[in-house]
Amino acid sequence: MTYRTDQATDLDTTRVGDTTTVSGWVSRRRDHGGVAFVDLRDATGLVQVVADPEEIQIVDELRMEYCIKVTGVVQERPEGTVNHEMLTGEIEIHANEVVILSPSKPLPFMLDDRSEIEERIRLRYRYLDLRRPHMAANLQARSRLTGAIRRTLDELGFLEVETPTLIRSTPEGARDMLVPSRLRQGNFYALPQSPQLFKQLLMIGGVERYFQIARCYRDEDFRSDRQLEFTQLDLEGSFWTQEDVLVTVEAVLKAAAREIRDVDLTDPFPRLTWQEAMDRFGSDKPDIRFGMEIVVLDDLFEDTEFGVFSGALDGGGTIRGINVGSRELSRAQADGLVDRAKELGAKGLVWIQVSEDGSLRSPVAKFLSDDEQSGLISRLEASLGDVLLIAADRWKTVSQVLGGLRLDLGRPNTQDELAFLWVTGFPMFEEEDDGTRTFSHHPFTSPVSIDEMVSDPDRAISQAYDAVLNGVELGSGSIRIHDPAVQRQVFEVLGIDEETAERRFGWFLEALEYGTPPHGGFAFGIDRLAMVLQGEDSIRDVIPFPKTQTGVDPMTEAPAEVDETQLKELGIQIRAEVIAAREEAGE
């Protein structure tokens, strides 16, 4: 049996008179004037099939999503029936034979992009959801994206190498996904959060340009752009400076934009230091498609009598504001902004609106001098009707509050713009909530100054960089430490004693002793890049079989219990309190 000679969109007016065989699904069926019209859909698109039910009686049995094979003759559509919204809208197939390859149960939802479907239902029947046109387009775009990446890196002389997925646990910021060993009971593998150490080992091994489209795993809390398992482009190069990395990654991202959006990005991406990004946009992944930048107001209020502002400055804090433009602002809306600022970490928020007569409408206006009021209008470039939002607190709090409000209230001029950006010069270390020190990127990142890292680690700057697109962090990279002595110093600053460092990383520290070349690299999420380029709000719409935000697969019902026999083979016993909690939850 021949299932097809053509796919749907292979057919056009140049094929009129040809006999063709196509296979696919019944997307739509309607009867008109004693003739049946069937829209047959395959992976390429739709083609209309015309059949006479009296001649081909099986047509009466066709229902939505039946899988069928049609043989017939390609004909031009009659005048007045051409459909310019279909690629095949000028032709139709006059059927000689229709074969039902597989019937379909009644559908749980319409496979129509116009239908609003609860996401959990979509994931429960993901195999049906993937037939919807926009989901099919997303998968096709993702395939083209990875193809463009591979072609670009191949042209640049990179070697594609696979690294292990059963590795030793070396936590990199999130919890590891652990895999118990049957042969060495009580021991565990980890699934890689990234191929970080193995790609560095490849540099030590003389593979000067490496890349991999790698599956990675992180047991972390979910957001719209997070999954337990994800795909990233991972690359590394020997004898590279930061500039070498950025230029290479730009070439890859430009190829991706050209492939998916048909856009040529010719100019170098803008660059901001981490400090500049936080000062101007209140974010280390700023969306630069619109302005609304944060403005420093400290000097304007250095002699203020307004206690909130003077108290912030006396306490070593800062006063900053943003102009969110002309908009209606009722008291309820103003209260909503204050509540939102508190959610973001502020104790409060000052809001001011420039009235039609040029005066300032605000609960705090009476506490501000004439010079302070006119200075605000000038500094924030305010016009009639504009709303000004001002925060006074520690620098970190003010930045995250105004940065969050900026994203809530700002809108890009167009959703089609691709605003790529590099953020460089990240702090080497961060402070945890409990006061302990942790790494900003990962502990294998090289500092700009080794001396400063040792003498004043909280002020040390790393050779790390992030790529940002439309406010979404695509990925990050760094120049790596290639001196084992420096690597040990970093561990020491992080509070990792020598014994712990040897136990967890001794094998890697030894490798660094064998003529390690200077090297650096980068990794970015394929899922996130595909999401932004396709204009989706969630990476779940560009992943074939994703998990929900609670880490569940509604289709297979993973994660699930396993047989007691399997647990015994692994030397694992589920604690009684876990079993009790599961039973109480009805699981």
Give the positions of each predicted feature:
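Class II aminoacyl-tRNA synthetase catalytic cores and aaRS-like
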Residues: 1-587
